[in-house]
Swiss-Prot record:
Start-end of Basic and acidic residues biased regions: 32-50
Positions of transmembrane segments: 447-467, 495-515, 528-548, 552-572, 579-599, 607-627, 691-711, 728-748, 755-775, 795-815, 822-842, 856-876
Species this protein is from: Drosophila virilis (Fruit fly)
UniProt protein name: Facilitated trehalose transporter Tret1
Span of the signal peptide: none
Length: 911
């Protein structure tokens, strides 16, 4: 696209010529103007126009103003002094000398008009000097600009017609002369290409003023430069016409200089932007092609995948290091080739951004011109897509390599790897290389080490069951003055039965911090010796105070054990056998209750206490053989010990790394969600609902009267006047409780939690109201000898119903519905609340019998169970077959990761 092809039809606008011709010389236009002025009798006005054009160095041809190329830019122009190039930069003395020379020339024009007219017509066509020079210098030459990338269509040709307007004589006289002034409008920032193609010829004084307003809109100021003032002689001239000629000539020079100066600056910016865009396009093509070739060569030459990744990473580093120097080097070349005024470019914000280069880049960069050759659009897109795919693969591989190095570093140093877990978790969530996660199988895996750990914990549960059932057979012989050396009043007897739940409350509160700081195994192990001491205090008691001290110490250990035993078992046993082995503590606890009832038939309270002191001995020995839980080791940052504990529990041939990493991720989530004050965390609205459900289930479990029935079984049967021996009745109740444990384990995952709670409530309500009716008839004097079997039957059904629902389910749902971040503190609160209710029931049961009779106490327990039925219907959710994430989403409205939460099996004897 050449400048000659885009010249347009502006040359024939005023004279009626067709478009597309070359611009006519100024002499032809002046000739036509002379003819019109001569016919109008204004020959003198023509000479004034001609003299002003000569004085202002306008030139002889419009081609000097609009050269061949529509985008003029100086090419290899000699560098001129700023004062010569821009008149407004000259000193006042130089300007005064220049104006004096112009005045002298104007005075000689009247004498040399014929010669000037002839010289004007014969003068050859010359290129216009952009700015007026006092010295003779070679004219500026022009070259075509680089085509802009975004100019794909031929520019629109703008026809600017010459406006020739013949002014009236009055206007001619007022202006002093008629001037032809070439004023191409400066290009605006919005449409630079269109502005460079516009051409116009301004005629007359009115068009001159209009051009001034246009230039003012283009940010060109017509204010006088500092130091420039009209000569005093011209201001004081008496000749008005001469003064007007001088003023208009001076303004013409200034307007022409400012106009071309603005055009030059805009053209320099346009050229720099054009070259920059072309270079960037070539740079991207070169980068993609070089990257694709290099990666293909790597795939062929690499002997292994690791070597390929290493070489590719080195290439990526070299590519990014060379990118900035290459761009900076090329842009410097472009700016040097298109810049003629470094001072003005330094002030421009856009050029400052382009010229900027990092300080640390000092070495030269060699650019291969062959690599900068452009290819077709299809090849360019294909190469870029291939390169982007390879780069994405490289990035993923680097992340995988980094993750592998982090794991290896943790294995060698043995430090706490939890600091790296957030990074690992983020990589996993983003869909990047995932770590192997332990997934339980459906087939049960029985390993003798896990069975040994379950048996050791279950022996501690047997001790707890024996201590819970001790008061039922022991109070019968303890209140007998023939068998006891001290007197035990009914009030003291109630304290013997009720002080253990009160101590269990304190133990439940203290058990939470103990298992966190001492460890699960150490906390359980620490209860063995206090158990033995408590039983010896009871066995050797010489007064009621020693018995109460022994019961309080035993109750404190029971409270700690009831919290720590299920936690240890849940954290050591695999999920595949957790249900089966989790049954052992409940079964051994019921065995302890049955053993206490059977031994109490043949032993007094002192001998029974010596038997209780012997039970913790095997429990103590076995606890020394088992390790601490791996989860507690992970929480303390002891990764190597956690690995050894897993190897002991899972077997030497088992791969424990996936499970160990899962424990570390779960612990990291718990640490991130933990707060400094966990008790305040319980009071949040989102945590109150699950906590209130757990506390409600504990409340209805204990207010059903189960502990009162267990503690006072023999006394109840004696008061009922049953034909069956009281000790035999307690044995029967213990056997039923033991058998109901297996039935509940089978049905709890098949029928559902709420269904078993419904059945349990109905059975307990019916039996409690029937027992209340039996005692009411007996207290009324009615003969009940014919129904002596009724109390035993009601007790059996009552124990069976309790063991099916309200015995195990409150403990089970405590581990299901409590949020992960508050499970420890919330479980401690629930356990303490359970023992508080147990203390209230056992301590006040004897007082309730004295106050409202046995029938009133059983009817009150039945009414509470009936209310608990509606609590279960409207408030307790069903958790059967749901993951912990689904349960928490329903309870709190959000999901958290709970990948390894122990399925805690309750101790049904802890009632």
């Amino acid at each position: 696209m050449s400048g000659r092809d885009n010249r347009g039809a502006g040359g024939g606008g005023g004279g009626g010529g067709g478009g597309g011709h070359h611009h006519q010389p100024l002499s032809s236009a002046m000739g036509k103007l002379k003819e019109k002025l001569t016919r109008a009798g204004e020959e003198l006005g023509y000479h004034r126009v001609e003299s002003n054009l000569s004085t202002s160095n306008t030139g002889t041809s419009l081609d000097t103003i609009l050269p061949e190329d529509p985008f003029p830019f100086p090419q290899a122009a000699p560098q001129r002094h700023p004062q010569q190039q821009f008149p407004h930069l000259q000193s006042p003395q130089q300007q005064r000398q220049q104006l004096q020379q112009q005045q002298l020339q104007q005075q000689q024009l009247h004498l040399q008009q014929p010669q000037q007219q002839l010289q004007q017509q014969q003068q050859p066509q010359q290129q216009l000097r952009l700015l007026h020079d006092v010295d003779d210098e070679p004219p500026l030459s022009f070259r075509p600009l680089l085509e802009d990338v975004d100019i794909n269509e031929p520019p629109q040709q703008i026809h600017v017609q010459q406006q020739q307007q013949q002014l009236p004589r009055t206007a001619l006289r007022a202006s002093g002369s008629l001037e032809l002034t070439p004023l191409p409008p400066p290009p605006t920032s919005l449409e630079p290409h269109r502005d460079r193609q516009q051409r116009s010829i301004v005629t007359g004084g009115e068009e001159l003023q209009r051009s001034k307003q246009s230039l003012k809109g283009s940010r060109v100021s017509f204010e006088k430069p500092r130091g420039e003032q009209l000569p005093a002689k011209a201001a004081e001239s008496s000749d008005e016409d001469s003064f007007e000629d001088k003023r208009i000539g001076f303004q013409q020079q200034k307007a022409t200089s400012v106009d071309h100066k603005g055009i030059l600056k805009d053209l320099k910016h346009i050229l720099a932007n054009d070259n920059r865009r072309q270079f960037q396009a070539k740079k991207h093509v070169s980068l993609d092609i070089k990257g694709t070739r290099f990666l293909k060569d790597l795939l062929k030459d690499s002997s292994s995948e690791e070597e390929f990744h290493k070489t590719r990473r080195e290439f990526q580093g070299r590519k990014h290091q060379s990118l900035d120097p290459r761009v900076t080097f090329k842009l410097d070349k472009v700016l040097q080739g298109s810049s003629t005024d470094s001072d003005e470019e330094g002030d421009d914000a856009e050029h400052k951004r382009l010229i900027h280069r990092p300080k640390d880049i000092t070495k030269p960069v060699i650019i291969d011109l062959k690599d900068l050759e452009s290819e077709s659009d299809e090849d360019f897109l294909t190469s870029r897509q291939n390169f982007q795919q390879q780069r994405s693969i490289s990035t993923d591989s680097r992340k995988s390599r980094r993750l592998y190095e982090m794991d290896e570093m943790g294995n060698k140093r043995g430090d706490n790897i939890r600091h790296a877990v957030p990074f690992v978790r983020q990589i996993t969530e983003d869909g990047k290389p995932k770590l192997e996660v332990y997934r339980p199988t459906t087939n049960p895996i029985y390993i003798w080490t896990q069975v040994l750990a379950a048996l050791s914990v279950s022996l501690g549960s047997l001790v707890v069951g024996f201590a819970s059932a001790y008061t039922s057979p022991a109070l019968v012989s303890m209140t007998n003055t023939n068998l006891t050396s001290f007197v035990v009043t009914p009030q003291a007897a109630s304290w013997v039965g009720g002080i253990m739940p009160l101590a269990g409350l304190a133990g439940g509160i203290a058990g939470g911090p103990f298992i966190e700081y001492l460890g699960r195994r150490n906390t359980i192990l620490a209860t063995a010796v206090p158990f033995i001491v408590s039983w010896l205090l009871i066995a050797c008691a010489v007064n009621v105070i020693m018995v109460l001290c022994g019961r309080f110490l035993a109750g404190f250990c029971v409270g700690i054990a009831s919290l720590s035993l299920p936690v240890y078992l849940g954290e050591t046993v695999q999920p595949e056998v957790r249900g089966t082995l989790g049954l052992l503590p409940t079964a051994f606890g019921n065995i302890g209750i049955l053993l206490c009832f059977v031994a109490g038939t043949y032993m007094d309270w002192s001998m029974l206490a010596f038997l209780g002191a012997s039970l913790p001995v095997p429990f103590l020995i076995l606890m020394f053989l088992i390790p601490e839980t791996p989860r507690w080791y992970v929480s303390r940052g002891r990764e190597e010990r956690a690995r050894k504990a897993l190897v002991w529990l899972r077997g030497k041939e088992a791969d424990v790394e996936p499970e160990l990493k899962g424990l570390m991720r779960s612990q990291a989530d718990a640490d991130r969600q933990a707060t400094q004050n966990k008790m305040l965390e319980l009071l949040k609205r989102s945590n109150l609902k699950p906590l209130s459900i757990s506390l409600g289930l504990m409340f209805f479990q204990q207010l059903s009267g189960i502990n009162a029935v267990i503690f006072y079984t023999v006394q109840i049967f004696q008061d009922a006047g049953s034909t069956i021996d009281g000790n035999v009745c307690t044995i029967i109740v213990g056997v039923v409780n033991f058998a109901a444990t297996f039935i509940a384990t089978i049905l709890i995952d098949r029928a559902g939690r709420k269904v078993l709670l419904y059945v349990s409530n109905v059975m307990m309500v019916l039996t409690l109201f029937v027992l209340g009716g039996f005692f009411y008839c007996k207290s009324s004097g009615m003969d009940t000898s014919n129904v002596g079997w009724l109390p035993l039957s009601c007790f059996v059904i009552y124990i069976l119903g309790f063991s099916l629902g309200f015995g195990p389910i409150p403990w089970l749902m405590m581990g299901e519905i409590l949020p992960a971040k508050i499970r420890g503190s919330a479980a401690s609160v629930a356990t303490a609340f359970n023992w508080s209710c147990t203390f209230v029931v056992t301590k006040s049961f004897q007082d309730m019998i004295d106050f409202m009779g046995a029938h009133g106490a059983f009817w009150m327990f039945g009414a509470i169970c009936f209310i608990g039925l509606f609590f279960v219907i409207f408030y307790v959710p069903e958790t059967q077959g749901k993951t912990l994430e689904d349960i928490e989403r329903k309870m709190m409205g959000r999901v958290r990761r709970m990948s390894s939460v122990a399925n805690i099996k309750p101790l049904s004897f802890n009632m």
